[in-house]
Curated annotation (Swiss-Prot):
GO terms for cellular component: plasma membrane; proton-transporting ATP synthase complex. It comes from Anaeromyxobacter sp. (strain K). Keywords: ATP synthesis, Cell inner membrane, Cell membrane, CF(1), Hydrogen ion transport, Ion transport, Membrane, Transport. NCBIfam families: ATPsyn_F1gamma (TIGR01146). Disulfide bonds: none annotated. The lineage of its organism: Bacteria, Pseudomonadati, Myxococcota, Myxococcia, Myxococcales. F-type ATPases have 2 components, CF(1) - the catalytic core - and CF(0) - the membrane proton channel. CF(1) has five subunits: alpha(3), beta(3), gamma(1), delta(1), epsilon(1). CF(0) has three main subunits: a, b and c. This is ATP synthase gamma chain.
């Protein structure tokens, strides 16, 4: 049975842990509010840009005037999956969920592609796939620190350059889509080539006018569309990470409080037993002196 001192030390240790988890929960809650605002502001623009460009591209394809390599279909032998994870842990199943989701995607598409490589955004994804000896083509570090659109633009530009150079025939983007503070959805979207199949029917009945030209418009907007999809994925992942960490720290804080209550009860019982034993010894000594 542990001594009173051991129990007191354990209570003090758990209280210190509770203070840390409570502080981390508050920090994550503040970051979540900012990240959630950024996601809600970005989503409408990203969705509208996606719809508009998909319709433009679908119309061009319908008229057999595809003039941009990001739209041109080709045989898909090699693929790349860009996986967005976090640099830090203590976020519940945030990182493990998306990593396992990507592993299932790789298994399900093993027959579709001759070779699938990975690019990781975040230390946790790199560590996960490196431990499983999977090919990591590119590791992006420092993206989550001071998250900015320029970083998403650079990442999208590098992926586009690899695609245009013929190093890969398809690029996919995997990330946690933010639903709520306690809910995230793992998704994999095709980044390149840009998929216009969903907008084909809607675009045929629309009369588009292009200034200065269709080719110039697509050349300007398609790379921006790819960058915006990457930017949205980074924002969605950041909000999901903060929400997952806030929930994990809230759960850890509650567990610490329950443990403190249990240890306090154990301490009081041990102290009561110790006092009772002392009284019995005093009474026994007094009886012996009679």
């Amino acid at each position: 049975m542990p001594s009173l001192r051991d129990i007191r030390n354990r209570i003090g240790s758990v209280r210190s842990t509770r203070q840390i988890t409570k502080a981390m929960k508050m920090v994550s809650a503040a970051k979540l509010r900012r990240a959630q605002d950024a996601v809600l502001k970005t989503r409408p623009y990203a969705v509208l840009l996606d719809q508009t460009l998909s319709r433009l591209a679908a119309r061009a394809a319908a008229e057999e005037q595809v003039a941009h390599p990001l739209l041109a279909p080709r045989a898909q032998r090699t693929a790349e999956v860009v996986v967005v994870t976090s640099d830090r842990g203590l976020a519940g199943g945030f990182n493990s969920n998306i990593c396992r989701f990507v592993q299932r995607f790789l298994t399900e598409n093993a027959d579709r592609f001759e070779r699938i490589a990975l690019s990781t955004v975040g230390k946790k994804g790199r560590e996960y796939f490196k431990a499983r000896r999977l090919e990591i083509r590119k590791d992006y570090t420092g993206v989550h620190a001071n998250l900015a659109y320029e970083k998403a633009e650079a990442l999208a530009r590098e992926a586009t350059e690899r695609y245009l150079a013929g190093e890969v025939d398809a690029v996919f983007l995997a990330y946690n889509e933010f639903k709520s503070a306690i809910s995230q959805k793992q998704v994999v979207v095709q980044l390149l080539p840009i998929d216009t199949s969903a907008a084909g029917a809607d675009a045929t009945g629309i009369d588009f006018k292009y200034e200065p030209s269709r080719e110039a418009l697509l050349a300007e907007l398609l790379p921006r569309h790819v960058a915006m999809q990457v930017w949205r994925a980074l924002l969605e992942s950041a909000a999901s990470e903060h929400g997952a960490r806030m929930s994990a720290m809230e759960s850890a804080t509650k567990n610490a409080e329950e443990m403190i209550a249990s240890l306090s009860l154990q301490y009081n019982r041990a102290r009561q037993a110790y006092v009772t034993k002392e009284l019995m010894e005093i009474v026994g000594g007094a009886e012996a002196l009679k």
